[in-house]
Each structure stands twice: as structure tokens, then as C-alpha cells.
């Protein structure tokens, strides 16, 4: 039996702690392998007083200076030792603790900070290991909200609908850059590199869009042929999704969807000029992630026909005639609203965008619990 835990605390100085603990052959091997590294120490409260259960403290990286060596051998390992001693753990456990070793001037203040941060991180990481935190449900809940501090952007997979998809089909680079500068920060916005835009500037236009917007970008290629090649080109240009034309040969559609799956992209299937969207959808061996419907498919009701069953399996997008005045009604049936000229032709596109997204609910972090406040050691909520 072996369990794992992790914790990171601190601001200017960070304490990064990874823990493996348990009983039996697996942890014994881990313990022995750590000992063979030669740069680890037994966690001790003072020389000749190691803590129980036996705990090895291992640096995450090579120690390259006398300052790092003194901090590791001294205050960092002591903080880990004190955390283990205070937890009063089962003596039969074996504990391996991996720590980073910051290189900071040795001052009383820095030593106190290091002790405080590593003590708390070690204690938290051990408790997390014992309680098998986080749960699978926690990871599933956080995967689309997580924002790693060293990355700076989220990997959006359309898991938090509804979305406003802004179709950018402007004729000049000046127009494009103007629009990109007006887009407000929102988790409900998707940008579409429109077909005319891509034809004029190439898929490299997506890289230009990235300089202003690092959210979800759709390459509206309306793929009709060479599905795999076009998807791969969009992937290399950092698109998050590719739009495939529903009037393409079925083999092209399937190959394009398959390539999207291989590349980790979201596949859109555009049903423009498709007379029987449901029949086409049902006939596909591989299903798209998003189906785009157009107002012309059902002018009378402007909604999903009762016999259509897309909603059970994928996200639905609607294009054509989408306005601020009908957002609430459309969101009853569709998860993505595609808007082009109503925004791009506006004198104040930023204001129009905000009018749309203000009707789409809260952003991801609005009611987010900070510092993992839902974490209750001993009984995870």
C-alpha cells in the first residue's frame, strides 16, 4: 500500500512538497531507492533524534551551493520532521518527502518563512496522502477551471456552456486587431477565425489572434476535402477546434473528426445546406463534438425539430439571426450562439459583446472556493 500527497504554499518563497507513504514492499523499495541517491537525509528534530515513522527528505533537484545545502540540512528538513512528529502517525509507516530547495539569503526572517511554509506544506501533503485527496470528483470538477500559475491560461474544452462564438470575417488586419482589442475577458467567449479571414491571411492568422486572446479559437475551414491534412494544419496553428462542412463526402467528415480526436481538438460539423442533418449525424461512425445548425434549416420555429436528437450527444450551435433580444430563448435549446456582423459591424463591438455575455451567466471563478476551502481533512466534501 502506498499513497501520495502534494502541497504548495508560500508566495515569494514557495515550499513545494510531494509525499509518498505507506507500508509494504512497494514503499520499502521507494524508501531504499531514495536512500541510494546519497543526497537525502532522515528527518530529524536535532542531530541524533530522527522522527518516527522513519521519514526521508529528498531534494527535488541538485543542491548547487552552500546556502542551499545549509537550508536543506537545517530549516527545511527540520520543518518536515516537526510536521511528522506533530501528526503522531502510525510508526509502521515509511514516509518519503520530496522538497524544493530555494536559494535565498540566510536571514532570520527567511529561515522563519521557510520553516513556516515547509512545515505547513509537509503536514498538508501528508494529510492529503492519508485521505487520498483529491478525489476523482474533485479533479473532474476542477479540470476546466484550473489555472496553473506557470502557464497563465486554461485549456478550454467547452465544458462550461453557454458560449458566444464571435465569427471574425473582417476584410483587413486593421479591422481584426481593432476587434481583438475590444473583446472583454470572459469564460463564455469563443473566437472563430472565419473562412474568408483564413483564405485571405492563412491559418497563421490564428497565431496573430493568440497575441490578443488566449481562449478557445475555432478554425472555420468548412473542410470539404483532405480532412486529415486541414485539421493537422489548424492544430499546428494552435486552433482549439475545426469546423467541417456537412456537405463534404462522408469519408472526409469521418477522417477529419478522427484527426481532431488524435490531435486533441474539438470537431464542429456545419450543417449549412444539409437537407437532413439528423440522418447525416446518425450515419457517422464517429460523432462530432459540436453540430452547427442554421436558421434556414427550420425558419418557422427557429429551434430544434422534435425528431432531432443531437442534444443527447453533443453541443449544439446556432448561426443566423442571433441577436441580443433572443438570447434567453435560444439558450433553452443551444449551447453556442454564433454571431458575426451584429458584433463586427457595430460601432462599439465591445459593448455589444458585453450585452450578449451578460445574459450567459457567471464566469467560472465567480463562486469558486479559494485555497481549496472545500477540502476537509478526514472527510472530503
UniProtKB/Swiss-Prot annotation:
Organism equals Methanocaldococcus jannaschii (strain ATCC 43067 / DSM 2661 / JAL-1 / JCM 10045 / NBRC 100440) (Methanococcus jannaschii)
A Pfam family this chain is assigned to: OMPdecase
* Catalysis performed (reactions): 5,6,7,8-tetrahydromethanopterin + formaldehyde = 5,10-methylenetetrahydromethanopterin + H2O; D-ribulose 5-phosphate + formaldehyde = D-arabino-hex-3-ulose 6-phosphate
Q: Where is this region: 3-hexulose-6-phosphate synthase?
A: 151-381
- Which SMART domains does this UniProt record tie to the protein? OMPdecase (SM00934)
Q: Tell me a GO biological process for this protein.
A: carbohydrate biosynthetic process
Task: Identify the stretch annotated as signal peptide in this record.
Answer: none
Cross-referenced InterPro entries:
Aldolase_TIM (IPR013785), Fae/Hps (IPR020868), HCHO-activating_enzyme (IPR014826), HCHO-activating_enzyme_sf (IPR037075), HPS/KGPDC (IPR041710), OMPdeCOase_dom (IPR001754), Ribosomal_Su5_D2-typ_SF (IPR020568), RibuloseP-bd_barrel (IPR011060)
UniProt cross-references to SUPFAM superfamilies, sorted A to Z: Ribosomal protein S5 domain 2-like, Ribulose-phoshate binding barrel
Under Gene Ontology molecular function, one entry of this record is:
orotidine-5'-phosphate decarboxylase activity
What is this organism's lineage?
Archaea, Methanobacteriati, Methanobacteriota, Methanomada group, Methanococci
CDD domains documented for this protein: KGPDC_HPS
Tell me the protein's name: Bifunctional enzyme Fae/Hps
Please tell me whether the keyword Nucleotidyltransferase is annotated for this protein.
no
- Its biological purpose: Catalyzes the condensation of formaldehyde with tetrahydromethanopterin (H(4)MPT) to 5,10-methylenetetrahydromethanopterin. Catalyzes the reversible formation of ribulose-5-phosphate and formaldehyde from 3-hexulose-6-phosphate.
Cite the EC number: 4.2.1.147, 4.1.2.43
Write the record's keywords in alphabetical order, separated by commas. Answer: Carbohydrate metabolism, Lyase, Multifunctional enzyme
Pathway in which the depicted protein is active: Carbohydrate biosynthesis; D-ribose 5-phosphate biosynthesis
The EC class name is lyase
Q: Which family does it belong to?
A: In the N-terminal section; belongs to the formaldehyde-activating enzyme family. In the C-terminal section; belongs to the HPS/KGPDC family. HPS subfamily.
Instruction: Note down the stretches annotated as region Formaldehyde-activating enzyme.
Output: 1-150
Amino acid at each position: 500500500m502506498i499513497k501520495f500527497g502534494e502541497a504548495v504554499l508560500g508566495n515569494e518563497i514557495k515550499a513545494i512538497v510531494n509525499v509518498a507513504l505507506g507500508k509494504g514492499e512497494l514503499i520499502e523499495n521507494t524508501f531504499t531507492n531514495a536512500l541510494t541517491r546519497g543526497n537525502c537525509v532522515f528527518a530529524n528534530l536535532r542531530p541524533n533524534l530522527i522522527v518516527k515513522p522513519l521519514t526521508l527528505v529528498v531534494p527535488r533537484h541538485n543542491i548547487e551551493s552552500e546556502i542551499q545545502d545549509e537550508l536543506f540540512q537545517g530549516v527545511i528538513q527540520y520543518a518536515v520532521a516537526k510536521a511528522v512528529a506533530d501528526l503522531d502517525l502510525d510508526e509502521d509507516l515509511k514516509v518519503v518527502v520530496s522538497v524544493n530547495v530555494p536559494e535565498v539569503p540566510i536571514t532570520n526572517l527567511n529561515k522563519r518563512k521557510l520553516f513556516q511554509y515547509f512545515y505547513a506544506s509537509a503536514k498538508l501533503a501528508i494529510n492529503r496522502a492519508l485521505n487520498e485527496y483529491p478525489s476523482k470528483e474533485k479533479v473532474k470538477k476542477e479540470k476546466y477551471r484550473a489555472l496553473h500559475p506557470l502557464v497563465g491560461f486554461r485549456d478550454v474544452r467547452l465544458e462550461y456552456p453557454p458560449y458566444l462564438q464571435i465569427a471574425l470575417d473582417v476584410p483587413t488586419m486593421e479591422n481584426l486587431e481593432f476587434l481583438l482589442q475590444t473583446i472583454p475577458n470572459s469564460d463564455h467567449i469563443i473566437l472563430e477565425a472565419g473562412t474568408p479571414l483564413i483564405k485571405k491571411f492563412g491559418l497563421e492568422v490564428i497565431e496573430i489572434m493568440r497575441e490578443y486572446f488566449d481562449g478557445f479559437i475555432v478554425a472555420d475551414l468548412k473542410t470539404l476535402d483532405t480532412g486529415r491534412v486541414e485539421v493537422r494544419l489548424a492544430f499546428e496553428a494552435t486552433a482549439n477546434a475545426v469546423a467541417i462542412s456537412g456537405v463534404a463526402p462522408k469519408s472526409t467528415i469521418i477522417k477529419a473528426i478522427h484527426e481532431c480526436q488524435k490531435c486533441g481538438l474539438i470537431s464542429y460539423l456545419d450543417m449549412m445546406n444539409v437537407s437532413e442533418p439528423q440522418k447525416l449525424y446518425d450515419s457517422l461512425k464517429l460523432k462530432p463534438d459540436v453540430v452547427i445548425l442554421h436558421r434556414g434549416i427550420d425558419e418557422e420555429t427557429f429551434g430544434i425539430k422534435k425528431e432531432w436528437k443531437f442534444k443527447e450527444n453533443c453541443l449544439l450551435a446556432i448561426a443566423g439571426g442571433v441577436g441580443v433580444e433572443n438570447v434567453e430563448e435560444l439558450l433553452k435549446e443551444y449551447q453556442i450562439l454564433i454571431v458575426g456582423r451584429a458584433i463586427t459591424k457595430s460601432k462599439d463591438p465591445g459593448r455589444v459583446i458585453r450585452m450578449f455575455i451578460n445574459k450567459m451567466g457567471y464566469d467560472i471563478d465567480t463562486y469558486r472556493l479559494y485555497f481549496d476551502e472545500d477540502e476537509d481533512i478526514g472527510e472530503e466534501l
